[in-house]
Amino acid sequence: YTTLFRSKDCSKIAIRHPAWSSGVKVKKNGREIFCERSESGYILVDLDTQEINRIDLEFQMEPIVIAANRKISYDARKAAIIMGPLLYCFESIDNGSEIEELGLYAQGELETKRNSIAGKEINTIYAKGTRRRELEGDTLYGVYQEMKEDVKLTAIPYFLWNNRGEGEMKVWIPVE
């Protein structure tokens, strides 16, 4: 992100550093400068006395597993993935049918890879997870046993879901 400021009326500018960004590179008039994030979530940039200051910002974005407040009962013990300001979702086209059977290892490593969906270059996120398996045979009930298998989950930005055909989609999935 780049912006220009006239510095006749001010000597500093406060720029909001979003909580989703793990860091930010700041360049002032083409030179990288160090700026600390304040407790209130802003970085302060001293402006030069020249007429125009050019400020370039590059926010670092890493995928993060988030949880909802426990007061939101519908999402209790579930997690979602964000990267920067984007919310991600899990589609059946990538993860198979019966999305309800998926679980996410919340402490697992998240991997990103560039892909194209609907003509847009995006970051796809891959995560370790599980899929519950069905009971064998046609019986309605059986002896309980651990019926999960490890799987690699694929998440895409929410705004792009349902662009590759109809199917199931979930944002919040159970945590393993």
Predicted regions span which residues?
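Short, small-residue-biased leader/transition segments that mark boundaries at the very start
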Residues: 1-4
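Hydrophobic, well-ordered secondary-structure elements that form the walls
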Residues: 15, 26, 55-57
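Surface-exposed beta-strand/loop patches in extracellular or lumenal glycoproteins
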Residues: 9-18
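Solvent-exposed beta-strand/loop surfaces of large extracellular or lumenal domains
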Residues: 21-46, 65-71
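Proline-anchored loop/turn motifs at beta-strand termini and strand-loop-strand connectors
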Residues: 18-21, 60
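Surface-exposed, short loops/turns at beta-strand junctions within beta-sandwich domains
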Residues: 49-51
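C-terminal beta-rich recognition modules with glycine/proline-rich loops and embedded aromatic residues
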Residues: 38, 54, 58-176
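Short helix/loop capping segments that flank catalytic or ligand/cofactor-binding pockets
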Residues: 12-13, 24, 66, 91
